[in-house]
Every structure is written in structure tokens, then in C-alpha cells.
């Protein structure tokens, strides 16, 4: 019978001893004779904690949407009944007045249908550009060659209405049949199509920031400043949307404004603007500018930051091959202009 070997007695050893081998718990190593194997225990605090999947929240009835839909339906019914009664009263008074009222009602209905159609087209166009941006970002990560060709074709359709991009479209179309990786194709499309648009967008943002800084520096009332900044911001967002292929109407502008504000909230744009203003105005520039000009510079920088966020939102391709415009460059131009005006 085989006798059991006695258990190993406690002993001391050095970790740098070549006869001591430290292995993980799941490793199986073939050790030589006289070699000591040490398997360290894992600290429970450092072990990964399994995260349970969050169950999707149960969505109830959209009472807010139902309320506004019902209110809009009742309003349309009331307006329709009022128009019908008005036309009936006009016919009762005079047949000619009835036909005139009927013609006005027809023109109003036709104009309303055109406005609704334009709003729907603008919303659909904005949704197309937004999805194109997301698809391009996915191709940059996955390098999908087939999907990149589809994105380039969709991008060429959007850019077809811009005569300034005729040469860029021809150059890009000549490369669509070549063997190019998906991510490289997206970068090529960005360099060819977005480069002139980015330069024009930077000019629009710089011009809007300078106008805001000048008007707010000379305006006598704070209410005028707020109103002008708001109008200038809306106009800038609309110009950038048209530049990059969007056609927003009233509802489209509301949607764009929400996206721009959300982008600023995510990226901390206002905080970045404040820190930049404090940094640049704290290096002796504040002493050179008067109080009103300093307020104008601040409003101009905030407008510029809003414009940069609008570029990110309205641009159909993410920044990959081209560097995004920086607030520091626009701030340098704005401050230099203000110094010249002060002198």
C-alpha cells in the first residue's frame, strides 16, 4: 500500500527566488522538481461586478400628445365650421359675395396645404441629413466599403443642388468606382465636398459674431441685446442648415434649435466659452476694452459657440479628415477687430 506523503510544513522563501513561480488561478503550468507554486487570491473588491440589464420602462399613453392632437382637431373643426357658415351667409346676402368668399377659402386652403407640404419636406430633409451623419460615423468605425458607396451617393444627391460643388462632385464621382476602403471613402467625400462648405460656414459664424458684438456694444437697452442675439442666432442656424443642404421651415427651425441646445448641453459649450473669455480677457485685453465693448465681445463669443454647435448638428458628415473650426480662432479674430475699433 502506498503511504500518504506528509503535508508540507510552513516555510519561508523569497519571491525573487528562481524556484518560486507565481501563477494565476486558471493557469496550469508544468513545474520542475523542487519548484514552489504560488497562486494569489483575488481581492473581492477588484472583481468585476455583473451589471444587470436595465428593463425598458413601460411607456404609458402619450397623454400630452393626445391632448395637443385633440386640441388641434377641435380648432380645425371650429375654423372649418366658421368658414362654412361665413360662406353660407355670404351666399344668402349675395351670390357674387358667396363666390368671392369661396375663392378666398380655396386660396387659403391651397396656401395651407403648400405650407404643410414644405414643412413636411423640411423635416424629412433634416431627418435624412441626421441619419446620413449617423451612418457615416458608423462606417468610419466599421470600415464598411459597400455602405460607404451608398452614403456617398446619398451625399451627392444632397449636394447636387449646390452649383459651387460641381467640380467637387465630379472629382468624387470619378473615385466611386475605385477600390477604396469604406472609412477612406468617407474621408475623401468629406475633403472634396465639405471643405468649401466649412470655409463658408466659418465665415458666416465669424460675421454673425462680429455683428452681434457691434450691435450689443452700442445698444442702449439690455432687452434690445437679448432680442438681437436671439434673432441673429436663429438666422445663423438657418443659414448653416441651408448651406449644408437642409431646408428647414418653422417646425424644422424649432427642431434644429433643440438639437443645437442639446449639443451645447452635452459638450459644455457655454462653460467653454466662459472659460475662454476669462482666459483671454484676463491677459490684459480687458484693460484695453471698455465695458460696453467687453459685453459685446462676450455676446459675440457666445454667438460663435452657438454657430459652431450648429455646424456640428447640420453637417451631413462628422469631422474626420478635416479639423473642426475652433472657438479660439474666432475669438482671436473678434478680439483683434475690437482692439482695432478701440484704437
Swiss-Prot record:
The keyword Membrane applies. It comes from the Bacteria. Pfam families: DUF697. GO terms for cellular component: plasma membrane. The keyword NADP does not apply. It is a multi-pass membrane protein. NCBIfam families: hyp_HI0043. This is UPF0283 membrane protein blr7254. It comes from Bradyrhizobium diazoefficiens (strain JCM 10833 / BCRC 13528 / IAM 13628 / NBRC 14792 / USDA 110).
